[in-house]
Design a protein with these regions (language model features):
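Glycine-rich phosphate/adenylate-binding loop
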Residues: 2, 109-113, 126, 136, ...
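Hydrophobic/small residue at the entry helix of a nucleotide-binding pocket
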Residues: 33-34
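Glycine-rich phosphate-binding loop and adjoining beta1-alpha1-beta2 segment
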Residues: 46, 51-89
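Conserved N-terminal Rossmann-fold NAD(P)-binding element of oxidoreductases
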Residues: 27-29, 52
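N-terminal charged helix/coil linker that caps or initiates catalytic domains
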Residues: 1-26
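Conserved SAM/SAH-binding loop
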Residues: 98-106
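Conserved S-adenosyl-L-methionine
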Residues: 42-48, 136
Protein backbone atom coordinates (compact mmCIF):
# COMPACT_ATOMS: atom_id res chain seq x y z
CA UNK A 1 0.00 0.00 0.00
CA UNK A 2 1.40 3.39 -0.96
CA UNK A 3 2.12 6.09 1.60
CA UNK A 4 4.05 9.36 1.67
CA UNK A 5 7.37 7.51 1.80
CA UNK A 6 6.72 5.11 -1.09
CA UNK A 7 9.03 6.92 -3.52
CA UNK A 8 11.87 6.87 -0.98
CA UNK A 9 11.25 3.18 -0.33
CA UNK A 10 11.75 2.51 -4.05
CA UNK A 11 15.38 3.58 -3.54
CA UNK A 12 16.12 2.30 -0.04
CA UNK A 13 13.80 -0.66 0.49
CA UNK A 14 11.34 -1.53 3.26
CA UNK A 15 13.99 -2.61 5.78
CA UNK A 16 15.84 0.70 5.49
CA UNK A 17 12.62 2.66 5.88
CA UNK A 18 11.90 0.74 9.06
CA UNK A 19 15.32 1.74 10.41
CA UNK A 20 14.57 5.39 9.71
CA UNK A 21 11.14 5.17 11.34
CA UNK A 22 12.83 3.94 14.54
CA UNK A 23 15.77 6.40 14.49
CA UNK A 24 16.20 9.50 16.63
CA UNK A 25 18.33 12.36 15.35
CA UNK A 26 19.26 15.61 17.10
CA UNK A 27 19.85 18.73 15.02
CA UNK A 28 21.71 21.52 16.80
CA UNK A 29 21.04 24.84 15.06
CA UNK A 30 17.84 25.36 13.07
CA UNK A 31 19.04 28.05 10.70
CA UNK A 32 20.08 28.28 7.06
CA UNK A 33 21.85 24.91 7.15
CA UNK A 34 20.07 23.05 9.95
CA UNK A 35 16.58 23.97 8.78
CA UNK A 36 17.13 22.20 5.47
CA UNK A 37 18.66 19.21 7.24
CA UNK A 38 15.50 18.93 9.33
CA UNK A 39 13.42 19.20 6.16
CA UNK A 40 15.31 16.33 4.52
CA UNK A 41 15.07 14.14 7.61
CA UNK A 42 11.35 14.77 8.11
CA UNK A 43 10.55 14.05 4.46
CA UNK A 44 12.59 10.83 4.61
CA UNK A 45 10.62 9.21 7.42
CA UNK A 46 12.74 9.87 10.50
CA UNK A 47 10.96 8.56 13.59
CA UNK A 48 12.08 11.20 16.10
CA UNK A 49 13.78 14.58 15.84
CA UNK A 50 15.28 16.76 18.56
CA UNK A 51 15.57 20.44 17.62
CA UNK A 52 17.98 22.65 19.54
CA UNK A 53 18.10 26.43 19.05
CA UNK A 54 17.39 29.47 21.23
CA UNK A 55 16.86 31.94 18.40
CA UNK A 56 13.72 33.53 16.95
CA UNK A 57 12.94 33.97 13.26
CA UNK A 58 14.14 37.38 12.06
CA UNK A 59 13.14 39.27 8.92
CA UNK A 60 16.75 38.92 7.72
CA UNK A 61 16.33 35.11 7.77
CA UNK A 62 13.82 35.19 4.91
CA UNK A 63 16.55 35.20 2.27
CA UNK A 64 17.74 31.68 3.14
CA UNK A 65 15.95 29.83 5.97
CA UNK A 66 13.20 27.40 5.03
CA UNK A 67 11.29 28.02 8.27
CA UNK A 68 11.33 31.80 7.77
CA UNK A 69 8.24 33.44 6.27
CA UNK A 70 6.48 36.71 6.99
CA UNK A 71 4.05 34.84 9.21
CA UNK A 72 6.78 33.20 11.34
CA UNK A 73 8.91 36.28 12.07
CA UNK A 74 9.28 36.67 15.83
CA UNK A 75 8.49 33.03 16.63
CA UNK A 76 11.01 30.60 18.10
CA UNK A 77 12.71 28.64 15.35
CA UNK A 78 12.26 25.30 17.08
CA UNK A 79 8.52 25.92 17.44
CA UNK A 80 8.14 26.85 13.77
CA UNK A 81 10.18 23.82 12.72
CA UNK A 82 8.10 21.52 14.91
CA UNK A 83 4.88 22.74 13.31
CA UNK A 84 6.36 22.33 9.83
CA UNK A 85 7.52 18.78 10.63
CA UNK A 86 4.07 17.81 11.85
CA UNK A 87 2.53 19.29 8.69
CA UNK A 88 4.76 16.87 6.79
CA UNK A 89 4.17 13.88 9.09
CA UNK A 90 2.22 14.17 12.35
CA UNK A 91 3.66 10.84 13.51
CA UNK A 92 7.21 12.13 13.86
CA UNK A 93 8.08 12.60 17.53
CA UNK A 94 9.55 16.08 17.94
CA UNK A 95 11.35 17.31 21.06
CA UNK A 96 12.25 21.00 21.13
CA UNK A 97 14.97 22.62 23.23
CA UNK A 98 14.99 26.43 23.39
CA UNK A 99 18.60 26.75 24.41
CA UNK A 100 21.96 27.88 23.12
CA UNK A 101 24.23 24.84 23.12
CA UNK A 102 27.67 25.25 24.65
CA UNK A 103 29.79 24.15 27.61
CA UNK A 104 27.21 25.66 29.98
CA UNK A 105 24.32 23.57 28.64
CA UNK A 106 26.06 20.45 27.32
CA UNK A 107 25.22 18.37 30.39
CA UNK A 108 21.50 18.96 29.85
CA UNK A 109 21.60 16.40 27.03
CA UNK A 110 21.96 12.62 27.10
CA UNK A 111 23.76 11.91 23.86
CA UNK A 112 23.44 8.14 24.22
CA UNK A 113 19.76 8.44 23.29
CA UNK A 114 20.51 9.75 19.80
CA UNK A 115 21.27 7.59 16.78
CA UNK A 116 22.91 10.56 15.04
CA UNK A 117 23.75 14.19 15.82
CA UNK A 118 23.95 17.09 13.38
CA UNK A 119 26.08 20.13 14.21
CA UNK A 120 24.73 23.18 12.39
CA UNK A 121 25.68 25.75 15.01
CA UNK A 122 27.91 28.73 14.34
CA UNK A 123 30.33 28.96 17.26
CA UNK A 124 33.58 27.02 17.55
CA UNK A 125 33.10 26.61 21.30
CA UNK A 126 29.69 25.03 20.78
CA UNK A 127 30.89 22.81 17.96
CA UNK A 128 33.80 21.47 19.98
CA UNK A 129 31.61 20.83 23.02
CA UNK A 130 29.15 18.97 20.82
CA UNK A 131 31.85 16.87 19.16
CA UNK A 132 33.40 15.93 22.51
CA UNK A 133 30.06 14.88 24.01
CA UNK A 134 29.26 12.75 20.96
CA UNK A 135 32.67 11.10 21.00
CA UNK A 136 32.25 10.30 24.71
CA UNK A 137 28.81 8.79 24.06
CA UNK A 138 29.88 6.93 20.91
CA UNK A 139 27.21 8.75 18.91
CA UNK A 140 27.83 9.51 15.22
CA UNK A 141 28.07 13.21 14.39
CA UNK A 142 28.42 15.26 11.22
CA UNK A 143 29.47 18.91 11.35
CA UNK A 144 28.78 21.81 9.03
CA UNK A 145 31.69 24.10 8.32
CA UNK A 146 31.35 27.64 6.93
CA UNK A 147 28.48 28.32 4.51
CA UNK A 148 28.40 32.12 4.73
CA UNK A 149 30.03 34.56 2.31
CA UNK A 150 29.90 32.00 -0.52
CA UNK A 151 28.19 31.87 -3.92
CA UNK A 152 28.95 28.42 -5.37
CA UNK A 153 26.90 25.51 -3.95
CA UNK A 154 28.75 23.02 -6.17
CA UNK A 155 31.96 23.35 -4.13
CA UNK A 156 30.75 21.42 -1.08
CA UNK A 157 32.44 18.15 -0.16
CA UNK A 158 31.91 15.48 2.47
CA UNK A 159 35.17 14.41 4.09
CA UNK A 160 37.12 14.06 7.32
CA UNK A 161 38.06 17.27 9.12
CA UNK A 162 41.77 16.52 8.60
CA UNK A 163 41.31 16.43 4.81
CA UNK A 164 39.72 19.87 4.60
CA UNK A 165 41.31 22.98 3.11
CA UNK A 166 40.49 26.61 2.24
CA UNK A 167 37.67 27.00 4.82
CA UNK A 168 38.82 29.19 7.77
CA UNK A 169 36.36 27.54 10.18
CA UNK A 170 37.60 24.09 9.18
CA UNK A 171 41.18 25.22 9.84
CA UNK A 172 40.31 26.26 13.39
CA UNK A 173 38.39 23.02 13.94
CA UNK A 174 41.35 20.95 12.69
CA UNK A 175 43.65 22.62 15.18
CA UNK A 176 41.25 22.27 18.09
CA UNK A 177 40.36 18.67 17.25
CA UNK A 178 44.06 17.74 17.25
CA UNK A 179 44.47 19.31 20.69
CA UNK A 180 41.59 17.15 21.95
CA UNK A 181 42.96 14.00 20.29
CA UNK A 182 39.88 13.61 18.09
CA UNK A 183 40.99 11.16 15.40
CA UNK A 184 38.11 11.45 12.96
CA UNK A 185 35.25 13.88 12.34
CA UNK A 186 32.88 13.81 9.39
CA UNK A 187 32.21 17.28 7.98
CA UNK A 188 30.60 19.07 5.08
CA UNK A 189 32.73 21.98 3.89
CA UNK A 190 33.26 24.17 0.84
CA UNK A 191 36.46 24.68 -1.12
CA UNK A 192 35.19 28.04 -2.32
CA UNK A 193 37.20 30.95 -0.86
CA UNK A 194 34.99 33.19 1.25
CA UNK A 195 33.99 36.57 -0.15
CA UNK A 196 34.31 39.78 1.84
CA UNK A 197 30.86 41.26 2.52
CA UNK A 198 30.22 44.64 0.90
CA UNK A 199 30.19 47.41 3.47
CA UNK A 200 26.87 49.25 3.38
CA UNK A 201 25.92 51.34 6.38
CA UNK A 202 22.29 51.55 5.24
CA UNK A 203 21.83 47.83 5.99
CA UNK A 204 24.41 47.45 8.77
CA UNK A 205 23.21 45.06 11.47
CA UNK A 206 25.13 46.94 14.12
CA UNK A 207 23.40 50.21 13.27
CA UNK A 208 20.01 48.95 12.09
CA UNK A 209 19.30 45.76 14.04
CA UNK A 210 15.76 44.42 13.52
CA UNK A 211 16.06 41.27 15.63
CA UNK A 212 12.71 40.34 17.25
CA UNK A 213 12.15 41.35 20.89
CA UNK A 214 13.50 38.73 23.26
CA UNK A 215 16.22 37.52 20.90
CA UNK A 216 19.07 36.22 23.05
CA UNK A 217 21.95 36.77 20.61
CA UNK A 218 21.25 39.94 18.64
CA UNK A 219 23.34 40.72 15.59
CA UNK A 220 24.59 43.90 17.28
CA UNK A 221 26.80 41.81 19.58
CA UNK A 222 28.25 39.58 16.88
CA UNK A 223 31.78 40.18 15.71
CA UNK A 224 30.77 39.99 12.05
CA UNK A 225 27.56 39.17 10.20
CA UNK A 226 28.30 37.12 7.06
CA UNK A 227 26.58 37.60 3.74
CA UNK A 228 24.27 34.77 2.71
CA UNK A 229 21.84 33.60 0.05
CA UNK A 230 19.16 30.98 -0.58
CA UNK A 231 21.24 28.52 -2.58
CA UNK A 232 24.43 27.81 -0.59
CA UNK A 233 23.49 27.01 3.05
CA UNK A 234 20.44 25.11 1.83
CA UNK A 235 22.62 22.78 -0.23
CA UNK A 236 24.92 22.17 2.74
CA UNK A 237 21.90 21.30 4.86
CA UNK A 238 20.51 18.88 2.29
CA UNK A 239 23.91 17.20 1.88
CA UNK A 240 24.06 16.69 5.64
CA UNK A 241 20.55 15.27 5.68
CA UNK A 242 21.50 12.84 2.94
CA UNK A 243 24.63 11.71 4.77
CA UNK A 244 22.68 11.05 7.98
CA UNK A 245 20.07 9.00 6.13
CA UNK A 246 22.64 6.98 4.18
CA UNK A 247 24.69 6.28 7.30
CA UNK A 248 21.68 5.21 9.34
CA UNK A 249 20.53 2.67 6.74
CA UNK A 250 24.02 1.55 5.69
CA UNK A 251 23.53 2.68 2.12
CA UNK A 252 26.21 1.44 -0.28
CA UNK A 253 26.46 3.55 -3.48
CA UNK A 254 26.74 1.86 -6.86
CA UNK A 255 30.23 1.73 -8.35
CA UNK A 256 30.86 3.18 -11.75
Amino acid sequence: MQDQYSRTQLLLGAEAMEKLHHARVAVFGIGGVGGYTVEALARSGMGALDLIDDDKVCLTNLNRQIIATRSTVGQYKVDVAEQRIHDIDPNIKVTTHRCFFGPETQDDFDFTQYDYVVDAIDTVTGKLALVMKCKEAGTPIICSMGAGNKMDPTRFEVTDIYKTSVCPLAKVMRTECRKRKIKHLKVVYSKEPAMTPIEDDSISCKNHCICPPGTQRKCTVRRAVPGSNAFVPSVAGLIIGGEVIKDLVGFVPLKG
